[in-house]
Amino acid sequence: MIMKRFWLISMLLIGSQLRGNACAHDVTYNYYLFHTWAEPENYYLRAADASEWDNHNSDRVHQFWCDYMGKKCNYLYDRDEIEERAKQKGDKEVLDYMKLLDEYMAVSEIINHESWEYPTKEELAESKTKCRKLFAAAQNYQGTRLKPQYALLQMRANMVMDQHQANVEYWEKTGSKQPKSVFREMMENIYAGALFHTGQREKACDIFARQGDSESIQWALRKYRNVAGIRRIYADNPNSHSLYYLVDEFVNDVQETIDGQNIFHDWDNESKLDAEGLKAKRLFFSEVDAFIQLVDQVVAEGKTKDPLMWVTARGMVNYEVGRQSAAQQDMERAAKLKGREKSQDVYRCVNMLIMTANPQMSSSKMLEELTWLRDKAKKDIQSGHDYDGYHHRAIQRVVLIGLAKRYHDQGNHTMENSLHGFYQNLVYTSERTNDDAETSDWNENYSGEYFYGLDTLTAAQLVKYYDELLRPHSDPLEKMIVESVPANPDYFNDLIGTKYLADGKIEQAASYLEKVPAKFYEGLNVSYYLAHRDYHKERWMVQQRSKKDVEGINKGRFTQNPKLAFCQEVLKLQDTYKKAKPGLVRYQTAYKLGTMIFQASSAGECWPLSRYGKSYGTDFEGHFDSKTGNWSNYDALGVMARSYLEESAKSADFDLRVRSLYGLAYMPFDNWADAEYHWNNGNGFYTYTPNRNSLQYAALKKLNQCVKGSANPTPAYVTKCDVLKKFRKYQ
């Protein structure tokens, strides 16, 4: 372990000049395909952030205390309880160890590289004095139960005292003979740091690499993370393990830089770049070309035992900078070269990504490779490192960026959507059916990019997509991908019917929803709302409160399809409405329709009839711009409900007319006024500037005129309306 570590910025990423961070926007899948230096079981450590090595060991150290206490605990938080237990047991051995451990932790807190302030000379001197005493106490331990812990304490104390040569000797004579444990691994990590401080960088980096300690190797090789540095390490030892790390970093820096530019498109037009940006771009490409020349030199000299790694790196770099033909030639060349097993894995993954950009991509070859990668990714998931396993991350980038982009550019949206389904099905490892969902508290069929992609489609597009899933596919790759996406008829009929319902096409919605059984809706995450919300109640009159635990499956029971029942009732009322002449029956029917349909809109309390989720704080998806007269995020049901209330507001019946106008005034299509907050003499208050062209303003104006111009007593709900009171003051 190296005491001082800093966050490093590659010369390829020149901060403000490039402005790109490929991890700074949604859904990039910017996972590094080029990983050759970490051991397979530590891929997840390399893929995660640099502190994962410490976190990984910390969890295993805490396990010692969990075993001692017989329950889950953490020494940092449960120290007093552990001490009390040791006292109860009369366990002097553990109590003595805890005392020394606390002393070391106190010293470590002072010199820790993450401390807010650097320690003073006096604090450093005092820390070394304490560590000399700590070392002596640990050295005098005569027991066996805590021997690994005391051995680790000795090496930690030496590390603080800068006794690096002593740590080298202690490990080689004593520490290395300890049985395998987390404490032995931590001792070896300190040994590697000692090797580095005594001039044995090569051996130190080999250990850091084997352990997956990216933070330490990053510090140890900080001066070599460019082509010139790679060339120097290669000249010293053509087969140095450090080269795997450095080549990885170079290739991945290229990938991250290009991904960042793909977001901002800064490099597409050099005329848009300032002088610094242009300089950065040219420096970047000069480094890329220098790296390619170095690869050619390495392979030509024949000194490396892993030419496959080098040429694969060349191909990945060429691919990232847009030299697709050169990248394909590199992959053809690499296929004939030898390399370690890890390099072979990386070659196959990189080759797959490059294949996706080839107009003549072999579908059968891609199928073969994707099947191999899928099986590898499954093992990642089963290992428990489902989001950090190398092959899992590789399949994300190959499938969701490489192949998905290919089919998007071809206009093949069936394959583009199905690839997301293929990946999601791989992760969740269950079929897309609501029966399967019953084993969980949450139905994953309604989350994830695959569902979100389907949810953006129109009803007609969903119909087409579902038909495409069902038809035979002759292309072997397309056949495998499409068939991996479960085409549950209940799921898709509900999706399509719900889309039509949201569009206000009630009859078409019913034709699909009538195919879906009632029990299906018990498996929806919105089952509670569907079962317990009443769309006959006026949203502007009644607030339907819910219990706390309302989200997830099996929160409601159904004897009939709730969406179909809604559609059938609306269709029946619409038939009555169409046949009725202007008069009370027509207006009452219009009011019922306006009430029901508004409840099913995004602003209603029965919104799960027309959608599967809703953002908190979002009252209404539709908005009317009174200045332009245009709609944005059009909500067909909300607009339809308004038209029915406008009709019922024509009624001569005072109560019906007032209720209709009150409902219109409630609808949040726009705001009747702009509110401005003021603060004066310790008091806060609002003033309102009316938007006289807004729909809500017009509704409030009509409501006000109606109740003021009538001899009928004003209903209490109108009298108490705060919004109407403000309207009367500021109109």
Where are these regions (language model features)?
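Hydrophobic alpha-helical segments, especially transmembrane helices
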Residues: 5-6, 20
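Extracytoplasmic/secretory-pathway proteins
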Residues: 20-156, 161-731
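N-terminal secretory signal peptides that target proteins for export/translocation
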Residues: 1-3
